[in-house]
């Protein structure tokens, strides 16, 4: 279950928040002002918009991304009930997990202390953790977890005009339609990013191949099955062809290895479209609700199919 849950957000990483205004995904301003200026990757999940969907109930409610795992363990908060929006950021070396919700801060902080986490006062804020990692609350609606030294820098710099999405990353985010409840954007390549993808899966193989991409976006609509769209921009036409052919190769081998008595798997492979347009590779898939389970199993199954 945990591995299946990781698929949807891992796909988003390989390429929040509610689309309330405008045509692109909406990032809650109180979260955006916390994003460091050196951020190269951002991913968002609008939990409120997908809480009642079958995919969330089956998979995303069990998701445990690396930074999210730390946050849940530290605070005891339940993503299924306590969080409304999630944002994950990285500069390629370190990153933050940010969340919006309605928190009983006093009760949570008391629990943190009972769990043995030290209270670290800093510039009017209380950090709970140790000298390596900590979590803090900003008011009763915003929580941030990450490396303790980075949290202190965030506090020092949060009101500076340089904070917020960097221009290149903002431009990428603005291309993601507001009907995508799970989304991500990155600039400057994927090297050094922890994508959280199972290495011994088909998706893990593709993730390894995508290290040469310069920038890209992913958006997933979960309201009626899985509607996935990824736009990947490479450094050269040759890089794009290599990635295009590699993804097509994984799909092709998967089709060839599908038993005759599993026609539903052929349907799944046929939903995946890969197109190269000069330096850009577009990947899309529209999976009907009755095939969601099989789609997740397909891309997380053990063993690597090599093109």
Regions found by a protein language model. Give the residues of each.
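N-terminal export leaders
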Residues: 3-7
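Hydrophobic lipid-interacting interfaces of membrane-associated proteins
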Residues: 149, 235-237, 279-281
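Short, surface-exposed beta-strand/loop micro-motifs that present aromatic residues
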Residues: 31, 85-88, 131-137, 216-220
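A conserved glycine-rich beta-strand in the N-terminal activation segment of trypsin-fold
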Residues: 131, 135-193
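Short, solvent-exposed coil/turn segments at beta-strand boundaries
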Residues: 92-94, 103, 123, 136-143, ...
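Hydrophobic h-region of N-terminal signal peptides that target proteins for export
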Residues: 11-17
């Amino acid at each position: 279950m945990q591995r299946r849950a990781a698929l949807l957000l891992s796909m988003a990483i390989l390429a929040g928040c509610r689309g309330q205004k405008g045509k692109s995904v909406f990032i809650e301003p109180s979260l955006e002002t916390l994003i460091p200026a050196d951020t190269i990757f951002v991913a968002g999940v609008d939990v409120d918009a997908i809480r009642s969907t079958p995919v969330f109930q089956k998979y995303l409610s069990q998701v445990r991304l690396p930074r999210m795992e730390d946050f849940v363990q530290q605070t005891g908060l339940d993503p299924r009930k306590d969080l409304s929006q999630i944002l994950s950021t990285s500069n390629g070396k370190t990153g933050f997990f940010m969340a919006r919700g309605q928190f009983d801060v006093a009760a949570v902080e008391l629990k943190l202390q009972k769990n043995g986490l030290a209270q670290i006062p800093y510039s009017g804020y209380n950090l709970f953790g140790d000298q390596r990692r900590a979590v803090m609350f900003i008011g009763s609606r915003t929580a941030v977890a990450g490396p303790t030294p980075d949290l202190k820098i965030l506090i020092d710099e949060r009101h500076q005009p340089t904070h917020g999405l960097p221009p290149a990353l903002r431009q990428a985010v603005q291309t993601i339609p507001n009907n995508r409840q799970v989304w991500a954007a990155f600039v400057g390549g994927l090297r050094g990013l922890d994508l959280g993808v199972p290495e011994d899966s088909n998706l893990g193989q593709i993730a390894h191949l995508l290290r040469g991409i310069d920038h890209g976006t992913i958006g997933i609509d979960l309201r009626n099955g899985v509607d996935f769209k990824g736009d990947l921009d490479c450094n050269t036409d040759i890089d794009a062809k290599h990635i295009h052919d590699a993804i097509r190769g994984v799909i092709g081998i998967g089709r060839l290895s599908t038993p005759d008595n599993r026609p539903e798997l052929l349907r799944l492979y046929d939903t995946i479209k890969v197109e190269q347009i000069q330096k850009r590779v577009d990947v899309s898939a529209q999976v009907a609700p009755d095939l969601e389970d099989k789609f997740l199993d397909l891309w997380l199954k053990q063993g690597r199919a090599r093109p």
